[in-house]
């Protein structure tokens, strides 16, 4: 399975970079995983609704440009479906079973994802009803993907 994590914004925090590097290393035994970091759109602090839409649309174009037609796209969004770790593992296993060898997880910028990205997505996933920093989501997502592979192989890790 080829997994892409497409994310808006540059990761700055050293501790997050270290955690992400660790999970990428662990995941290399199970799948080819790449993190694609795309620049966020520079915008002033107080945006109108119209300006917010423009920012999301510009970021959305960058995201969609990185997704091929044969990729199964999972948008990370607060309004997405929440799953347990076991349910998430089953979902990933089903994708592999049904021949979906390319999977892209999409993490938007601080304003979220554009409507075009949401339309392109095959499903939407939420890790919590809480708002979480999009940079932290990369680490949380990688840990859950790793956990899913361990669950699916019956390997110790998940409790």
UniProtKB/Swiss-Prot annotation:
<comment type="similarity">
    <text>Belongs to the RNA methyltransferase RlmH family.</text>
</comment>
<dbReference type="GO" id="GO:0070038">
    <property type="term" value="F:rRNA (pseudouridine-N3-)-methyltransferase activity"/>
</dbReference>
<dbReference type="GO" id="GO:0005737">
    <property type="term" value="C:cytoplasm"/>
</dbReference>
<keyword id="KW-0489">Methyltransferase</keyword>
<keyword id="KW-0808">Transferase</keyword>
<comment type="function">
    <text>Specifically methylates the pseudouridine at position 1915 (m3Psi1915) in 23S rRNA.</text>
</comment>
<comment type="subunit">
    <text>Homodimer.</text>
</comment>
<dbReference type="InterPro" id="IPR029026">
    <property type="entry name" value="tRNA_m1G_MTases_N"/>
</dbReference>
<dbReference type="InterPro" id="IPR003742">
    <property type="entry name" value="RlmH-like"/>
</dbReference>
<feature type="binding site">
    <location>
        <position position="108"/>
    </location>
    <ligand>
        <name>S-adenosyl-L-methionine</name>
    </ligand>
</feature>
<dbReference type="InterPro" id="IPR029028">
    <property type="entry name" value="Alpha/beta_knot_MTases"/>
</dbReference>
<feature type="binding site">
    <location>
        <begin position="127"/>
        <end position="132"/>
    </location>
    <ligand>
        <name>S-adenosyl-L-methionine</name>
    </ligand>
</feature>
<keyword id="KW-0949">S-adenosyl-L-methionine</keyword>
<feature type="binding site">
    <location>
        <position position="76"/>
    </location>
    <ligand>
        <name>S-adenosyl-L-methionine</name>
    </ligand>
</feature>
<keyword id="KW-0963">Cytoplasm</keyword>
<keyword id="KW-0698">rRNA processing</keyword>
<dbReference type="Pfam" id="PF02590">
    <property type="entry name" value="SPOUT_MTase"/>
</dbReference>
<protein>
    <recommendedName>
        <fullName>Ribosomal RNA large subunit methyltransferase H</fullName>
        <ecNumber>2.1.1.177</ecNumber>
    </recommendedName>
</protein>
């Amino acid at each position: 399975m080829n997994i892409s994590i497409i994310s808006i914004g540059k990761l700055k925090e050293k501790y997050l970079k270290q955690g992400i590097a660790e999970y990428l290393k662990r995941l290399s035994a199970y799948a080819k995983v790449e993190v694609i970091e795309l620049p966020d759109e520079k915008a002033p602090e107080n945006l109108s609704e119209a300006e917010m839409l423009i920012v999301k649309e510009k970021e959305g174009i960058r995201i969609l440009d990185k997704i091929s037609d044969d990729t199964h796209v999972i948008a990370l969004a607060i309004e997405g479906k929440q799953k347990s770790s076991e349910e998430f593992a089953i979902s990933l296993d089903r994708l592999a079973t049904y021949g979906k060898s390319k999977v892209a997880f999409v993490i938007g910028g601080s304003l979220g994802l554009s409507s075009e990205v949401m339309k392109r997505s095959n499903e939407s996933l939420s890790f919590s009803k809480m708002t979480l920093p999009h940079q932290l989501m990369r680490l949380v997502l990688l840990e859950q993907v790793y956990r899913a592979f361990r669950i699916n192989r019956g390997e110790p890790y998940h409790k």
